[in-house]
Amino acid sequence: MVCDITELKAHDGRKVYLEIIKDLATNQLLTWSISQHPNLQFALDPLQQLLKQLPHTGYQLTLHTDQGWHYQHRAWRKLLRQGNIRQSMSHRATCLDNAACETVFSKLKAEIGPDTSYRNQEELSQAINEWIHFYNERRIQTKLGNQTPLQYEQNLVA
């Protein structure tokens, strides 16, 4: 799994922050958080959601992030330990180490159109949420055998 944060700005100049956790096996965006402030709770929310929905298999998972302060915080690391998740971090100033997230952010920004075309944070946040559901449920991906991430996951467990 990979995790990262991106920033978008509505027409009124106010910012919206998006954090995603992506499953590399299915390309599904497992959890996400949208906020007007990139504070610690914003960063912890998707990880807390992830821990609630992950099945307890006994296997240790790995979650890769950049070296942002959120991911170095003791509260973040404590949640990882509680979920038996191994932390992996990019090298300093090496965004390509987390290309799987950067690609999603690039597609989001291209497909929802210019973030400044949304009048305010609420409109932009709604567009982001709608796009994430589209990405998981309706956006066909060649890498997944021309299936959506959700279809691919369902076929894996079938």
Regions found by a protein language model. Give the residues of each.
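Charged DNA-binding/catalytic regions of mobile-element recombinases
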Residues: 1-158
